[in-house]
UniProtKB/Swiss-Prot annotation:
Residues 332-352 are annotated as: Disordered. This is Rhodopsin. The modification N6-(retinylidene)lysine is found at residue 296. Photoreceptor. Light-induced isomerization of 11-cis to all-trans retinal triggers a conformational change that activates signaling via G-proteins. GO terms for molecular function: 11-cis retinal binding; G protein-coupled photoreceptor activity. Its main location: membrane. GO terms for cellular component: membrane; photoreceptor disc membrane; photoreceptor outer segment; plasma membrane. The gene is RHO. Glycans are attached at residues 2, 15. It is a multi-pass membrane protein.
Length: 352
């Protein structure tokens, strides 16, 4: 084996030289140079600096502006809450442990950090699924005269919590476990060891299929059908400038969403699956650290895509920051860009 396994940890380095130490008790500077740990801490600080304001502002602006309290925006708010979970309970912990060079908070802290990081990530991922399904049902109309209302939104939000807890909870209850990963400064599910006493392999397979492949498939299906529907509508109404604009806006949003999803999550999932299928092989600590930390940047990408690209949200944010005035003068224009398209007409194709 090219790693060192101990109680509640796995260090991706052989202990033949005797230098490997418990990542809960000693700095891990034999895995990487101190400046690399400092770079991770600086990166996490940047994510906190960007992620907290934009997600908190999303919640604050929605509470302040009644016109934003629409069923579809419940999902957007849930997305912001998920990102705040990641920022407050995951990023802050990882920043501090990176500054110290090891997971200073012990096994209990590792379980807490791993749980909230996984919970936040899964809540965000399943929120994207609910948004994709909502867009598909409203625009593609597989059910005629369907109106996405408050009840549907609350059901969607509840589903994101149920699915997130179904992924983040089992390692705390004895099905798999959370351990330090990569450079040992953040915690995640144990992909590294079979650990039969906690049925680790079955949980990783379950997590990969149910909580990664399934949502990815749903998102691609829904947005793929959405693009086809918009193109078909544009072909039937060649002279409709509104439809042409809707096609461009929806297509742009879909492309950005898909790219950001792939950039954030596929590297992490791919590396995790490789480690799981090649347990005991030789790979360095940075091999898992880079994709794991990069996946955390989804806390910034998501609100940019689903909120800042929406004129109504954007203008309300500007008005809040500018004490009720919009220096861009788009108040009236923004009113026409409806976030609540899912609650109104079923006869038009409308971008989110």
């Amino acid at each position: 084996m090219n790693g060192t396994e101990g109680q509640n940890f796995y260090v991706p380095m052989s202990n033949k030289t005797g230098v490997v130490r418990n990542p809960f008790e000693y700095p891990q500077y034999y895995l990487a140079d101190p400046w690399q740990f400092s770079a991770l801490a600086a990166y996490m600080f940047l994510l906190i600096l960007l992620g907290f304001p934009i997600n908190f502002l999303t919640l604050f602006v929605t509470i302040q502006h009644k016109k934003l309290r629409t069923p579809l925006n419940y999902i957007l708010l849930n997305l912001a809450v998920a990102n705040l979970f990641m920022v407050l309970m995951g990023f802050t912990t990882t920043m501090y442990t990176s500054m110290n060079g090891y997971f200073i908070f012990g096994t209990v802290g590792c379980n807490i950090e791993g749980f909230f990081a996984t919970l936040g990530g899964e809540m965000g991922l399943w929120s994207l699924v609910v948004l994709a399904v909502e867009r598909y049902v409203v625009i593609c109309k597989p059910m005629s005269n369907f109106r996405f209302g408050e009840t549907h939104a609350l059901i969607g939000v509840s589903c994101t919590w149920i699915m997130a807890l179904a992924c983040a909870g089992p390692p705390l209850l004895g099905w798999s476990r959370y351990i330090p990963e990569g450079m040992q400064c953040s915690c995640g599910v144990d992909y590294y060891t079979p650990t039969p006493e906690v049925h680790n392999e079955s949980f990783v397979i379950y997590m990969f299929l149910v909580h990664f492949v399934t949502p990815l498939t749903i998102i691609f299906f829904c947005y793929g059908r959405l693009v086809c529907t918009v193109k078909a509508a544009a072909a039937q109404q060649q002279e409709s400038a509104t439809t042409q604009k809707a096609e461009r806006e929806v297509t742009r949003m879909v492309v950005i969403m898909v790219i950001s999803f792939l950039v954030c999550w596929v590297p992490y999932a791919s590396v995790a699956f490789y480690i799981f299928t090649h347990q005991g092989s030789d790979f360095g600590p940075v091999f898992m650290t880079i994709p794991a930390f990069f996946a955390k940047s989804s806390a910034i990408y998501n609100p940019v895509i689903y909120i800042l690209m929406n004129k109504q949200f954007r203008n309300c944010m500007i008005m809040t920051l500018c004490c009720g005035k919009n220096p861009l003068g788009d108040e009236e224009t923004s009113a026409g860009t409806k976030t609540e398209t899912s609650t109104v007409s079923t006869s038009q194709v409308s971008p989110a």
